[in-house]
Structures are given as C-alpha cells and as structure tokens.
Amino acid sequence: MLNAVSDSLLSIFYPQNCHICKNSVENRANGVACEACWKNTHIFSDKDVICGKCCAFLPESGHTTEAFCRQCDEHVYDSVRAVGVYELALAASIVHLKTTPFAVEKLRFLLNKAFLASPFLNTDLIVPVPLSSRRLLERGFNQAGLIAGSLSKNTGIALDEYSLVRTIHTPMHRAAMDKKAREMTVKNAFEVKRPKLMAGRNILLIDDILTSGSTASHCAKALKKSGASKVNVLTLARAA
C-alpha cells in the first residue's frame, strides 16, 4: 500500500517515461521500462526449451533434462542460464546499468529468480566477469560485479571479485562483430591471481550479456586452469 502511494506521488512530482515506448512508468520497481514493455520482453521460463550452453531456442522435443544444440560444444564453461532475451525492457535496463549503477532493483530481482530456478544451487563461489583496469577507471564500477554482489547477498554464497582479472584491455564488443572477431579480442585476456581459492570449487560466473560466449569461455578456461571443478554461467540476457 505504502509503495503504491509512494509510486503515485513520485509519478506526479518526478515523472519518469519508459525508455522504450515513452509512456509513464507507474511502478518504480520496474526501473526504466513500463509494465507493458516488460510484459512484451521475453523472460525465460520453464516452458522454454533452450540450449544449456548458448541459450539458443531449441525445437520442442519433450526434454525434461538439459538440452544442447551441439553448435557450441567448444565452450569451456559447463552450462549457462540467462534471465531472458536481450530486447525491449531487458536491453534498456542493461544499457542503463552501464551508466547508472544504483538503478538495478529489477535486474537484481530477475537474476535472483533465474538463479533459484537454475541447476546451479550447489555453487561454492560467485565470480563476476572482470573489466580491465582502464575500463574500470573509465566507468567507475563493474556492472557484472554489482549484480554478482547482489546475488551473493541474497543467496549467502561467497563472492570473489578480485581473483579473476582481465590482464589485457580489449576493445568493446560491437553488434557487427562476428564470432571469430569476438574470440580474438578476449583470447588470453584473463588470468587468476589466487588460484588456491578456485581449486576444487564449483564457480558461478556472472555477466550482463552473453553473445558468442567467447568472453565467458575464456574466463572459464582461466578458472579451470587454476583448478576449478566446474564453471557455470549466469547472465542477464542472451543476445542474438
């Protein structure tokens, strides 16, 4: 009741328009998008049959266990889950996250929900995909670290933001880059500074967007080289 009154007052004195349709955002918990745009955004559910390594949609086949498309077997990580498709409200929220670190309530909620529905509940350690020191200085924060920290707080699973590091400053991935180009930008870009902390652990790697899987795969390679038993990936969105 109080939240509804608060939202009504805020919408009067500090109106906020949806970043997609420009209509008013009535519920501030929805962040930068209105309720209608969130409903039009594809958030994955147990009704979706998706590949366990790239989150691509698979034909209906009566699967009751994890299914794979077999087009992405080269990925080093073991399995991946995403909140939804990189579109509409989810895409707008992730873009906003990169510049406004405090506006992540909706994304935190969705990530936590996706984790609880995932097969990753036996995770020992949560690790965010790191930024290079130069990119971190430019941005001021690591968006993957923000959502990883929130998940750690909600689940009680330990967080390690410092062991996995990006040693090479790589160019930002662009939509037009193909899989091979993305692969080259992150090759040998990651290493683990404290390998003893990874030995024998089930790691959950957190990132904001999964596109080709190259970044997550090279992070997993470094983590497994340091002795990690398993590396699974949880991301906010699967991009086309």
List where the protein language model places each region.
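Glycine-rich phosphate/pyrophosphate-handling loop used in enzymes and phosphotransfer proteins
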Residues: 1-207, 211-240
